[in-house]
Every structure is written in C-alpha cells, then in structure tokens.
Amino acid sequence: TLFRSAEFEFSDQDFQNIRRIINRIAGISLADGKRELVYSRLSRRLRQLGLRRFDEYCTLLETSNDTVELGEFVNALTTNLTAFFRESHHFDFLANELLPAFMRDRGLTNRRLRIWSAGCSTGEEPYSIAMVVRETLPAVGWDVKILATDLDSNVLATAQRGIYDWDRVKDLPETRRRRWFLKGCGAQAGQVRVAPALCDLISFRRLNLMEDWPMRGVFDIVFCRNVVIYFDKPTQSALFERFADRMIKQGHLFVGHSESLFKVTERFTPLGKTIYQRCL
C-alpha cells in the first residue's frame, strides 16, 4: 500500500483507478510521477466528504451520478498555470501579422472575427487576446467575439469576475495597465478589475472538450495552449481533427510551448513556434 501511514489509505490500485476515471471523464493522462499530487489534491475531497479511504471515493465517482463531485474531482486534478501575455510571441503574431492581414484581406462586407480560447483557465488568456484586438482593430465596423471555455468551473468563476491581484498585472507596460485595468480601492485595494471594453468581447462557458460542442459556426482563430499536454496521442489527434472541422480554411491555431502537432494531425501546417494554420 502506498502512503499507509498517511491520513487516508491510498493503494496502487486506487491510483490506477483514479488515472482511469480522470482519463475517461476528461481525456487526461496522469503520469506515474503524479501519485503524491493526486493524494494531496484529492485528500481535501475525502476530508470534505467524510470518507476514510480512496477506494470509497473511487466507488463514489464510479457509481453515483453526482455531477457536482465529478466536477470537483476534475477541478482538483487539472493544473491552472497562466499569466497575462504568457508566451508573448503568440500575441505579437496576433497584433503584427494576423489582425493586420484580416484588416487588409477582408472587405467592408466581412468584418467578422471569431476567436476561441479553449482551456482559458482563470481568464488571463482571453483578456490578453481582447487587449490585442482592441489595440489593433478599428473601434467601429468590426464584429468580434471571443469564446472562452474551460472544464473547471472554479477557474471560470474567477475569469468571469475579472478581478486580479496587482501582482498579476504589475509587469505589464504602464500604458496597457492604465488603459485596461481599474485599480481597486477600499476593500479592493491591491486588486484590479478588467475594463468593461474587454469583458464586452468575451463569453465564458464551461465546456468539456471530450464531449459534444454546442457552438454553431466556425472560428478564425483558436488558442488551445497547454491543454493537450495531459492527453494521450489518440485523444490529441481526435481533438485537433475536431478543431480543424470548426475553423475557417486557413484558420490559425496556437498551442502551448511544449506541444507539437507533428505526427498528431495532417490538417495543420506550422507557421512558426507553436503557431499553425489549417491546410486541410
């Protein structure tokens, strides 16, 4: 048994069961080295539910239709590491290449832009996209919508609130900070709120990428960064096929710094570091 002296009994079999369940529900592949992480993150769930052993928790996940607990289970095991303008070369490409090309190539009749931030976490990514859009495209005449989705309802709630600690924005250029964030005072001192002009562009929705996608229409640009690192290759292939089907021809896809579509899908061609264009 693993961690016998610990607060909860957690065996090899329990760990394998957890891996199987998270893979089935969310397509996430947990590595062998994640045992301690699984134990520490899920111990809180056992404590809250008044359970003594991990096998009881696995049974609960497998047999009950408690979607709330399944959500908590997924929330506990998904990692949320994000920052404003993380992997800044993506935002430079968006500002300097992609949006100017849209302005140049789209006549007066097709000034519609649809962007999807898939796995948006606590919201820094879609708000960063929105800043670039507002700074680059003319204020009038363009119909822009950003869809921001995540599996984790807790991080989505943070994203939707749009309130962040000062630390999260202190490294942004001052002009950007002043333009897009309102400083809190009183009880909100030390915090900032995202400007309404950014919030207006974004719709936040809970979405499991493994399930059906309710959205209609196609996207010009998809950000899916540091999401598929948790998925096995067949799951990645299936996901990128679905993305391609939901994008315009020549649509652009941004993936995370350690992710690659090499031998995963034929439907995108690389344009640069972790930037792809739909080709099929």
How would you describe each model-predicted region?
Residues 3-116, 254-256:
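Conserved AdoMet
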Residues 98, 102, 133-137, 163:
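Active-site catalytic pocket residues across diverse enzymes, especially alpha/beta-hydrolases
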Residues 110-123, 145-147:
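Conserved class I S-adenosyl-L-methionine
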Residues 118, 139-223, 227-238, 260-262, ...:
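Extended basic-aromatic, gly/pro-enriched interface segments that bind polyanionic ligands
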Residues 122-139:
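Conserved SAM-binding loop of SAM-dependent methyltransferases across substrates and taxa
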Residues 237-249:
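A short glycine-rich, Lys/Arg-flanked "PGG" loop and its adjoining helix->strand segment in the class I
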Residues 258-280:
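Class I S-adenosyl-L-methionine
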